[in-house]
């Protein structure tokens, strides 16, 4: 089922999401809905708070293969990269955001197994962006102000 994307101003987007304690059918259904919603909206990632659920679940589109990450935790970061990001919860806006170039993170899959992942480039950026959502942060909170320019006449 495609779910409504919560937009900037919705309090759930500024709230730290709760850890998933049990991976039951409700969590699996939410994950399926999140994948369907992400694809419908042409997104590359989606966090549960963006569809109104305060749970630490994200989905990312990796080479057209959606991955569900439950209770993701970034454990290593290296390098730094500045690039523009958009967000389904902040429509029509792109802002420059500094992110780690490479990350190591762990998360549970839908079977409850904890796995360790290494990511770089776009995948690393998407995972960091979605984990920010779980911590109540939006791209507007991370925008690099010195790179924002206004047109002067």
Curated annotation (Swiss-Prot):
Which GO BP terms apply?
co-translational protein modification; translation
Q: EC no.?
A: 3.5.1.88
Q: Which cofactor does it need?
A: Fe(2+)
InterPro entries under this entry? Peptide_deformylase, Peptide_deformylase_sf
Q: Which residues bind Fe cation?
A: 87, 129, 133
Instruction: Work out whether the entry's keyword set contains ATP-binding.
Output: no
**What does the entry's cofactor note say about binding and number?**
Binds 1 Fe(2+) ion.
Iron among keywords = yes
What is its EC class?
hydrolase
Which reactions is this enzyme annotated as catalysing?
A: N-terminal N-formyl-L-methionyl-[peptide] + H2O = N-terminal L-methionyl-[peptide] + formate
- HAMAP family the UniProt entry points to: Pep_deformylase
**PANTHER family documented for this protein:** PEPTIDE DEFORMYLASE
Protein family per UniProt? Belongs to the polypeptide deformylase family.
Q: What is this protein called?
A: Peptide deformylase
Organism for this UniProt entry: Dictyoglomus thermophilum (strain ATCC 35947 / DSM 3960 / H-6-12)
Q: What is the lineage of its organism?
A: Bacteria, Pseudomonadati, Dictyoglomota, Dictyoglomia, Dictyoglomales
Q: By which gene is this protein encoded?
A: def
């Amino acid at each position: 089922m495609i779910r409504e994307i919560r937009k900037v101003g919705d309090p759930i987007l500024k709230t730290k999401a709760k850890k998933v304690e049990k991976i039951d059918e409700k969590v699996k259904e939410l994950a399926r809905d999140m994948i369907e919603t992400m694809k419908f909206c042409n997104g590359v990632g989606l966090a549960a708070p963006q569809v109104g659920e305060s749970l630490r679940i994200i989905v990312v589109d990796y080479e057209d293969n959606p991955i569900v990450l439950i209770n993701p935790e970034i454990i290593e970061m290296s390098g730094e990269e500045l690039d523009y990001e958009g967000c389904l919860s902040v429509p029509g806006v792109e802002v420059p955001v500094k992110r780690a170039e490479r990350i190591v993170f762990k998360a549970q899959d839908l079977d409850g197994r904890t796995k360790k992942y290494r990511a770089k480039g776009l995948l690393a950026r998407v995972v960091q962006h979605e984990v920010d959502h779980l911590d109540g942060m939006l791209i507007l909170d991370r925008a690099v102000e010195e790179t924002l320019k206004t047109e002067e006449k």
